């Protein structure tokens, strides 16, 4: 699923993910998360500064495998040397990639992603998105993604929930049955033109 806020200043989007993860408690009502393990990719990365990149990725793995980490890291432009660096030695883009790998390899069956590809170039975004799709389709990982990018929502979502500009109400739900692995840029453009026509952001 994808949460698509109508506003670029939508602060409640992160609150939704924090409530689902159990990091915050609702003031009323109840949220039941019945998944075995929930992973959270924060917008600000949240790497542990006293651990190397390699250790940050391995810390939540059920069975840490350095060879697997190195192989996946190389796909997204991280060398073995980069994996031995501490977070303060990494650029913002490198830290985001480390945080992404940590989520991908943590063994969660529910992944919560808050604007995961912001600040990354198009080629890298495509690589990470492909890796995420493979994880979803091959291993059955459930995913809730927050994004303001309409094309990203069209590529990665089976269901898009458009959120109201002044709260957490769902204004519209778009269902996309086409398998994620069969989607391409033409599909994304068609969905954006059809489903997001006339949508304006509120400041």
Model regions and ranges:
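Short, small-residue-biased leader/transition segments that mark boundaries at the very start
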Residues: 2-9
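Helix-to-loop junction immediately C-terminal to a conserved catalytic motif
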Residues: 21
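Conserved ABC ATPase "signature" region
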Residues: 66-82
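Conserved ABC ATPase signature
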Residues: 86-90, 94
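Hydrophobic anchor residue at the start of the ABC signature
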Residues: 99-100
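Catalytic Walker B motif of ABC-type/P-loop ATPase nucleotide-binding domains
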Residues: 111-115
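Helical segment within the ABC ATPase nucleotide-binding domain
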Residues: 125-139
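Conserved beta-strand-loop-alpha-helix hinge in the C-terminal portion
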Residues: 166-195
């Amino acid at each position: 699923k994808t949460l698509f806020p109508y506003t670029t200043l939508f602060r409640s989007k992160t609150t939704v993910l924090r409530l689902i993860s159990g990091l915050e408690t609702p003031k009323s009502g109840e949220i039941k998360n019945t998944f075995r393990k929930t992973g959270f990719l924060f917008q600000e990365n949240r790497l542990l500064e006293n651990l190397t990149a390699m250790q940050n990725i391995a810390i939540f793995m059920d069975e840490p495998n350095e060879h697997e980490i190195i192989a996946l890291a190389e796909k997204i432009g991280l060398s073995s040397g980069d994996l031995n660096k501490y977070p303060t030695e990494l650029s913002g883009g490198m830290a985001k990639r480390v945080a992404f790998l940590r989520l991908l390899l943590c063994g969660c069956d529910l992944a919560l992603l808050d604007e995961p590809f912001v600040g990354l170039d198009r080629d890298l975004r495509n690589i990470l998105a492909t890796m995420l799709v493979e994880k979803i389709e091959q291993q059955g990982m459930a995913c809730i993604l927050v994004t303001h990018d309409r094309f990203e929502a069209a590529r990665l979502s089976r269901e898009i929930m458009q959120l109201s500009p002044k709260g957490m109400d769902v204004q519209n739900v778009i269902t996309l049955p086409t398998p994620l692995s069969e989607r391409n840029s033409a599909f994304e453009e068609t969905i954006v033109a059809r489903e997001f026509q006339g949508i304006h952001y509120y400041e």
